[in-house]
Regions:
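Conserved catalytic cores of phosphodiester-cleaving nucleases, focusing on short active-site segments
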Residues: 34-49
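Short acidic/glycine-enriched loop/turn segments that link adjacent beta-strands
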Residues: 27-31, 82-83
Length: 133
């Protein structure tokens, strides 16, 4: 799995003519991982392949709202085996994509030593709707 920094570097290497993404490192309470003047970006790295990938409703709502307020797009990137799967959430909302929102018991954090589970509202991003890099 790539680190968040490696995902950002890979994105920037692929999109040389665009403004580079910058990691949000100085704000531990940020709801997104990287940004540019065009994008708010949530990044996940996974070690298992899925046909649909989980997106948390809380992050969806707050980042989509922030994107609208600042005139940017909300991009969701999942890295799997060095491949980037990229969804433009604004575009999916514009075409009435069905996220299939529902509640599930999931780990409170991605810190695997913390086994505490909480109910989270989540939806799904189908791989077939992603751009692959």
């Amino acid at each position: 799995m790539l680190t968040q920094t490696e995902v950002v570097k890979r994105w920037n290497d692929i999109h040389l003519i665009d403004e580079p993404l910058i990691e949000v490192e100085d704000n531990p309470f940020s709801t997104y991982d990287a940004q540019s003047s065009e994008y708010i970006v949530e990044i996940k790295s996974r070690d298992k392949l899925y046909d649909s990938w989980i997106i948390e409703k809380y992050k969806f709502d707050i980042n989509l709202e922030d994107a609208a307020r600042t005139g940017r797009d909300f991009i969701y990137i999942t890295e799997y085996r060095r491949k980037l799967l990229v969804w433009n959430i604004n575009d999916l909302v514009a075409v009435d994509y069905c996220f299939n929102w529902h509640k599930r018991w999931l780990p409170k954090t991605t810190d695997f030593e913390n086994k505490e589970k909480v109910i989270k509202e989540v939806g799904y991003l189908l791989t077939s709707y992603a751009r692959e890099y």
